[in-house]
């Protein structure tokens, strides 16, 4: 069974190229799908990462699924707030003969 967070790249506040390299590394290690996850302000970076991967690095990758949701998170002071999240699933065609 595959661990839950395997083949997942969490996007935060780093430069997009850092996440692009992480996604490309996952594909290079033999994964057929990679999920890019982000919340809040990092959503636009996640979208950029997916497009950079598809257009420049893994040209045969395609969007398998995109999910947008609202999550409730608890802040430092115990207050609950709602944050938008996105999960972008990129996939490559299965290797021939597999």
Predicted regions, residues:
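Histone-fold modules and their flanking histone-like tails across chromatin and transcription assemblies
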Residues: 1-27
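Beta-strand cores of modular interaction/reader domains in eukaryotic scaffold and signaling proteins
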Residues: 10, 35-37, 87-89
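Short amphipathic alpha-helical molecular recognition features
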Residues: 11-15, 38-41, 45
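Residues that cap or initiate secondary-structure elements
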Residues: 15-17, 42, 72, 94
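Arginine/glycine-rich "motif VI" loop of SF2 helicases in the C-terminal RecA-like domain
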Residues: 29, 56-61
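Short, surface-exposed connector motifs at secondary-structure boundaries
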Residues: 29-35
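Conserved helicase motor "Helicase C" RecA-like lobe of SF1/SF2 P-loop NTPases
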Residues: 41-58
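C-terminal edge-of-domain segments
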Residues: 63-98
């Amino acid at each position: 069974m595959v661990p839950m967070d395997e083949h997942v790249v969490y996007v935060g506040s780093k430069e997009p190229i850092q996440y692009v390299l992480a996604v490309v590394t996952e594909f290079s290690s033999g994964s057929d799908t990679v999920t890019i996850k982000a919340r809040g302000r990092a959503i636009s970076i996640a979208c950029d990462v997916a497009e950079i991967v598809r257009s420049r690095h893994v040209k045969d990758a395609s969007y398998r699924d995109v999910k947008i949701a609202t999550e409730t998170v608890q802040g430092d002071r115990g207050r609950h707030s709602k944050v938008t999240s996105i999960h972008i699933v990129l996939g490559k065609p299965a290797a021939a003969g597999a």
